[in-house]
Regions:
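A residue-level marker of the well-folded mature domains of exported/periplasmic proteins
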Residues: 3-355
Length: 355
């Protein structure tokens, strides 16, 4: 199938206009959404995915319900399984699960409910009735790193969630380093990059994370790419207190803080609608049992041009660099295990890996 996430023209385009919760007379909900760790309205991964569920449902007169696994950030595979089972028992024809941590629970539940269509966002296929949807985060990470160095920043930072085990976060960060390196090489300079996975295991804000990045800003770091759910709140706070900047992730996060100068975005909302259309139009078999990667070629990753605030690096320059990725002139390494870019021995970037 054509993996271009181009949902049918919709009547409602703003997910915020659609209620997060609805009640049906029979207690049945046709689309279930099982959240990743962190909050539902995280302004990032969960929210972007759920927006796709809400938009598809609202525009196709379908019922929907979200399920948060018990025990929050300490949710177990069993907690995730229970949430998925609740969705299935409540009549779901399609269940969208967010985040790579869902794999064990999803493998089990998919085998038990062969007639339900499951989506694994940020994961591969783990069953004949599971469609994986993954994104080329390394590409938008690259574009963000390239953009901030072209803008004139020379002291960068990266903080990510999942302790370096989340493949999507690893690709974002490694892409960011590669893009910054490419821009620095073109400009004949060397840039610095502080890099850490500390205090990111729960994808939540913390005083420890804020203190860490506060120290970075104090010591000259100018812009930090924060990649991990609600962690951005700690970085935005530190940035605001130090006249620093940050790069958002997953969605256009610029409305969340004035310190956010661009965002490495992936098309979660469109990607989910694209997938659900296969279920409710009767062609799920075309994407089931495998994983589809959505990249710059499918217009599924990039930087937000509608809220562009960079002064020295223009939208036109960005689009020229994006085109090179689309046409294959630039290949960004998508190594999902490169949690420490210092090991990549990039030519024009000095990585200070903090663990």
């Amino acid at each position: 199938p054509d993996p271009t996430p181009d949902p049918t023209p919709t009547v409602i385009t703003n997910a915020d206009e659609i209620a997060d919760e609805m009640t049906t007379e029979d207690g049945k909900y046709e689309i279930g959404f099982v959240t990743d760790v962190g909050q539902l309205k995280d302004g990032s991964f969960n929210q972007g995915t759920f927006d796709g569920v809400k938009l598809y449902a609202a525009n196709h007169n379908l019922s929907y319900k979200y399920y948060m696994p018990a025990n929050g950030d300490k949710a177990t595979d069993e907690d995730r399984y229970d949430a998925m089972k609740a969705a299935c028992d409540n009549g779901a024809k399609a269940v969208v699960t967010a985040g790579f941590l869902q794999e064990a629970a999803l493998t089990k539940i998919a085998a038990e409910y062969p007639d339900v269509a499951f989506f694994f966002v940020d994961g591969g296929s783990v069953g004949a009735n599971v469609a994986g949807i993954v994104f080329a985060e390394e590409q938008c990470g690259y574009l963000a790193g390239y953009a901030v160095v072209k803008e004139g920043f020379e002291k960068l930072g990266f903080t990510g969630g999942g302790g370096g085990t989340n493949p999507a976060c690893v690709r974002y960060g490694y892409g960011f380093a590669q893009g910054a390196n490419a821009a620095a090489a073109e400009m004949g300079k060397t840039v610095e990059l502080n890099y850490t996975w500390q205090y990111g295991n729960s994808y939540s804000p913390s005083s420890e994370l804020q203190a860490l990045v506060n120290g970075w800003y104090n010591n000259g770091t100018e812009v930090i790419f924060c990649c991990g759910g609600n962690m951005y709140q700690s970085v935005a706070q530190a940035a605001a207190e130090n006249d620093g900047y940050m790069v958002g992730v997953d969605t256009d996060q610029s409305p969340l803080s004035e310190t956010i100068i661009t965002s490495a975005m992936k098309g979660l909302t469109d990607g989910v609608q694209w997938g659900l259309a296969y279920v409710f139009e009767g062609s799920f078999a075309d994407i089931a049992g495998k994983s589809t990667t959505l990249s710059a070629k499918e217009n599924a990753v990039g930087l937000p041009t509608a809220t562009w605030s960079l002064k020295n690096f223009t939208v036109e320059q960005y689009q020229a660099e994006l085109a090179k990725i689309v046409n294959g002139e630039i290949t960004v390494d998508n190594n999902s295990e490169m949690s420490n870019p210092e090991k990549a021995e990039l030519s024009n970037i000095k990585v200070n890996f903090v663990g």
